[in-house]
Amino acid sequence: MCDKSKENLRQIKSYVQRAGRVTKKQQQALDNYAAKYLIEYAKDRKLDFTEIFANTNDVVLEIGFGMGGSLVEMALANPAKNYLGIEVHKAGVGNILYEIEHQNIANLLVMSHDAVEILENMIADQSLASIQVYFPDPWHKKKHNKRRLVNQTNIDLFAKKLKVGGVFHYASDWLPYAEEVLELLENDSKYRNLYSGFAPRPEWRPLTKFEKRGQNLDHPISDILFEKI
């Protein structure tokens, strides 16, 4: 892909910033807990994970955590890992801030900004143990496919930020999107499939709202796990 095409893809957002309803509890969490658990975007600042988490544990990045329920569950189940979640919608950010405070979660921090810009400008190369993208917007219409978060440009970006041996984990209930991602990764020499084709659903991945909705619609659930080599 030429540099100009890559630049055009970077400028296309994978999300639409909607003014969704924020509950009183969520707004109070945004007002009261953002200073403690929400990292502000700063283009010229690289995150020092040892400093912000106060340990040297592996860091897992989740892009698009929604309301945050599954990410909270994973952080609580894995106290020896650090989790950084990215979500652009205020309701989800407020919800997870409330949970972090009231469940006293020490290994989870969040950001609310474009994930690609965070990765490009604030995440050091080879610093992440895992990148998780669960049930991203599939942008069903062909004319909107270019908005999909997981494309070749971003797969290249993920590889830069993952440590050698780090894992990219993608899950979707939209098979055409999952097949596209699988093909891109299978043909990328920077990655190795940890399974043959799609992975079995990991028991440790919590059930999400979008996964439940997909199951109710009889959509097949696809997990993909690739290791950076």
UniProtKB/Swiss-Prot annotation:
<feature type="binding site">
    <location>
        <position position="137"/>
    </location>
    <ligand>
        <name>S-adenosyl-L-methionine</name>
    </ligand>
</feature>
<keyword id="KW-0489">Methyltransferase</keyword>
<comment type="pathway">
    <text>tRNA modification; N(7)-methylguanine-tRNA biosynthesis.</text>
</comment>
<keyword id="KW-0819">tRNA processing</keyword>
<feature type="binding site">
    <location>
        <position position="141"/>
    </location>
    <ligand>
        <name>substrate</name>
    </ligand>
</feature>
<dbReference type="Pfam" id="PF02390">
    <property type="entry name" value="Methyltransf_4"/>
</dbReference>
<feature type="binding site">
    <location>
        <begin position="208"/>
        <end position="211"/>
    </location>
    <ligand>
        <name>substrate</name>
    </ligand>
</feature>
<dbReference type="InterPro" id="IPR029063">
    <property type="entry name" value="SAM-dependent_MTases_sf"/>
</dbReference>
<feature type="binding site">
    <location>
        <position position="87"/>
    </location>
    <ligand>
        <name>S-adenosyl-L-methionine</name>
    </ligand>
</feature>
<keyword id="KW-0949">S-adenosyl-L-methionine</keyword>
<keyword id="KW-0808">Transferase</keyword>
<feature type="active site">
    <location>
        <position position="137"/>
    </location>
</feature>
<feature type="binding site">
    <location>
        <position position="62"/>
    </location>
    <ligand>
        <name>S-adenosyl-L-methionine</name>
    </ligand>
</feature>
<feature type="region of interest" description="Interaction with RNA">
    <location>
        <begin position="143"/>
        <end position="148"/>
    </location>
</feature>
<comment type="function">
    <text>Catalyzes the formation of N(7)-methylguanine at position 46 (m7G46) in tRNA.</text>
</comment>
<dbReference type="InterPro" id="IPR003358">
    <property type="entry name" value="tRNA_(Gua-N-7)_MeTrfase_Trmb"/>
</dbReference>
<comment type="similarity">
    <text>Belongs to the class I-like SAM-binding methyltransferase superfamily. TrmB family.</text>
</comment>
<dbReference type="GO" id="GO:0043527">
    <property type="term" value="C:tRNA methyltransferase complex"/>
</dbReference>
<feature type="binding site">
    <location>
        <position position="173"/>
    </location>
    <ligand>
        <name>substrate</name>
    </ligand>
</feature>
<protein>
    <recommendedName>
        <fullName>tRNA (guanine-N(7)-)-methyltransferase</fullName>
        <ecNumber>2.1.1.33</ecNumber>
    </recommendedName>
</protein>
<dbReference type="GO" id="GO:0008176">
    <property type="term" value="F:tRNA (guanine(46)-N7)-methyltransferase activity"/>
</dbReference>
<feature type="binding site">
    <location>
        <position position="114"/>
    </location>
    <ligand>
        <name>S-adenosyl-L-methionine</name>
    </ligand>
</feature>
<dbReference type="InterPro" id="IPR055361">
    <property type="entry name" value="tRNA_methyltr_TrmB_bact"/>
</dbReference>
